[in-house]
Amino acid sequence: MDGKSEFKEELINYILLKKYGKGAQDPPVYSNALKKAPQEMFPPGLVDALDSYSINLSRSEGVEFLVLLNSLVNDIRSEEVKDIIFGMINTNQMLTKLMKDKKEVERFPDTCKMYSEQFKANKPLLKEFNAGSRKEQGNLEIGEPSENVVTRFPPEPNGRLHIGHARAALLNWYFASKGNGRLLVRFDDTNPEKEEERFERGILSDLSLLGINEYTLSHTSDYFDKIIDLGVFLIGEGKAYADNTPQEVMRDERGRGVESRCRSMDVEESKRIFKEMARGNASGYCLRAKIDMSSSNKAMRDPVIFRVNESPHHRTGDKYKVYPTYDFACPIVDSLEGITLSLRANEYRDRNQQYYWFIDNLRLRNRPKIHDFSRLNFENTVLSKRKLKYYVDNGFVSGWDDPRLATIAGIKRLGMNMEALREYILMQGVSQKTCTISWDKVWAINRKKIDPVSARYFCVQQRDAVEVSIDNTSEYTMDVPKHKKNGDLGTKEVFYSSQILLSQEDGRVLQDNEEFTLMNWGNAIVKSKTVENGTVTKMEVSLNPDGDFKLTKNKMSWVSKRGSVTVELAEYGNLMNDEDTEDLALRFNRNSVKKEYWYAESAIINVREGEVIQFERNGFYYCDGFLVFNLLPFTKQKRTGN
């Protein structure tokens, strides 16, 4: 699928909603939609046939599926089931390709007829769905000159970048790189209590992951002397004053538009106090801009522009005792650094008036153009830096790169391809519309990127693994392609032997005398199966070299007992639970990670940290360390059969 259609599986949800009033199904949509449909809607054999479906069918598997469907479609009486099957075919690249292949369609004429009828019936809905999908795509046009643009990305070095920051970073990078522009990465280091040099290194690493490597680096602290001078200038203009009103009282007064008792303070007295603040001797005072306490825009009600803070700064040490607020420093440094385009989240929109008040009243020559955009919100995702910091600092998670966190480093360890992330974020454009995004859409693009370049391996769950004896083979090794459709990935050495392991789940499915397929090997026939207390303990099988894998229902992954390697497979979930409490400790989801141990084929020892692979019939995994793998979200596959 291309960038505009990778979410087409949502078509099934759209049809079910419009025609049958059904609520949206979670991905995989087709599978969950089928589960929710009443079983009496399915003629005999159809459920098993649909079980062989996968979004990533090979050509031979696609033909097999359509041929199998051909023998059953005329018995389907339910329009809802027909529509689900229509959606399954319509959103599957391989199946739609086969439906247009004149040589192949002769093998499944009834399937083609059913599909054609449903296509005609659903044509109006298809048009609506596709039109809606186009509207959802953002654009990157803001009506500003595209040449010599200078943008800035100003992160605070008090944590790592999360996916929300990624949008701001990439939009600033995009507009700067369009035509001879420049991007400035400026660390907003105005709060020495929270900021550390290690976070600067981490943020630069995050930007590198996003592919942002060309920029000019600066710090707000580079301009502290100039910013302080401008604070003094504002006092001299009668447009700033020192204030020792208690914080809670000040908050209440600003909310009600009540002027501070300090607002009429003499200019020289404010200068004297500000000088003492700069020495760290005026505890309890701040400096406020004198703007308009009656303004309907609360951002204009005499905002604080300097605070005393005696904590040592990670760059300037104890040189300064007074620090500017972000709202005061930002327009100053934007102007001084020659920024032409200031891209900001629209949550700051009420501060735009304040931003330009500072530019104008400080008589700064360069006046950047502000363009704001909506934040990206994601379902069940914590983007509050305060909450993330709490869980990191208190040991609930392993660090800022924990896979449960939506930080750039965290989702990298979940197997996110950064090119896919860039593509998705830029596809949202500079929209003003705030919306909540489902992660499955992002991971759908990710799968499109990783699937063609991920090597394939087998693994079997250790718990109650079934020992299988093969009575007509010997031990040997053979080189097998790591990916049948991508020879560039090379080969792996597979060890074949008379003693292999199957998962308990697969062992239970196989019946006595059943012919099944051992993937990457051939067909085999079950000779005997030993079951103790409901658990399959061992099996005996014979290889059938003349068997046709196209005729077997069950295709099983396996590993040789000798040479198998134990791997840790981790599945990460949501960071927080649904408890109705403000206590972050109680909100932590203590079931947010599940770890299991599996036997993997011996070639797995060659997989290096950072690689993404597929354990076939299981899911895609990110190698998080030697023999440690993290499941990529929305890639877990059905185990039994197929």
Swiss-Prot record:
Single GO molecular function: glutamate-tRNA ligase activity
Residues the entry annotates as binding ATP: H162, E347, V382, L383, S384, K385, R386
Keywords of this entry: Aminoacyl-tRNA synthetase, ATP-binding, Cytoplasm, Ligase, Nucleotide-binding, Protein biosynthesis
Organism annotation: Encephalitozoon cuniculi (strain GB-M1) (Microsporidian parasite)
GO cellular component, one term: methionyl glutamyl tRNA synthetase complex
Name of the protein in question: Probable glutamate--tRNA ligase, cytoplasmic
InterPro entries assigned: aa-tRNA-synth_I_CS (IPR001412), Gln/Glu-tRNA_Ligase (IPR050132), Glu-tRNA-synth_arc/euk (IPR004526), Glu/Gln-tRNA-synth (IPR000924), Glu/Gln-tRNA-synth_Ib_cat-dom (IPR020058), Glu/Gln-tRNA-synth_Ib_codon-bd (IPR020059), Glu_tRNA_lig_a-bdl (IPR020061), Rbsml_bL25/Gln-tRNA_synth_N (IPR020056)
Enzyme Commission numbers on file: 6.1.1.17
Predominant localisation class: cytoplasm
Compartments (UniProt record): Cytoplasm
Record's catalysed reaction(s): tRNA(Glu) + L-glutamate + ATP = L-glutamyl-tRNA(Glu) + AMP + diphosphate
